[in-house]
Amino acid sequence: GLVCLIEEQPAVLICDLPSEENEQFQLKKYGLYALKHTYNQGIIFKGFAVPAENLLQVNRGNGLTIAYHGLNLGRVALCANAAGTMRLMMASMIPWGQFRRTYGEAIADRELVRRRLGRMAGLIVACDALVAWCSTMLDQGYRGEMECIVAKIFGSEAQKEAAIELFMKTHGGRSFLHGHLFGDNVHEYLAPCIYEGEGEMLGMAFFKSLVKHHGSTYFEPIGKALHAAGIKKPNPFNPGHAWALKGPLS
């Protein structure tokens, strides 16, 4: 699927990529710390022809509606991947805790390490629950956009916390050895905070979605009435201002 602009409107096209590069289609190779386990290449299109019948049509919205649906699926997948990744971390922490001894006792018996394992177990269960919730809604035909945003933000932040605060600190200096699960994959653990939408930006988008209906229903008419009356600094104690707002506030 290719997201593009057609007559200044977002659209999605289904396109078949050529088997080799040509003047209209080239691959851009670049270094990337994250996703190093995948075959990652940039794609450059120059006058690339796509049949008109490959344009996807939607009953409501435009191409962004299709793109956002794909993002929703990706955000749920991110949360599911976080749960699986944290399971791998825990599977490494438990035997290490039994092997590593300090002051004559395995660190697995220390309350600090037990707290970390308990915290990670809770994060895993929470991610599993969010995946089940969101995937069920999507399977039933709901857009689930806000729910998937919650899953993405929580899953990425949970994985970051688990990697840095729980996994790395339990393994100590060994975390930075070549071949260690943390050192070899630290960028993979942090990338979800950025990919599929940066977390804090998504949080603001989530809030905007929550208040959009209320704002357009109640506050927008007030703004329009003030603009029509030429009032830039409304004063509720000014009778003229109050009269201008009698409609929206009634």
Positions of the model-derived regions?
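Short, flexible helix-adjacent loops and helix caps
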Residues: 98-105, 136-143, 172
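Alpha-helix capping/hinge segments and adjacent helical runs
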Residues: 145-242
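A short core secondary-structure module
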Residues: 1-25
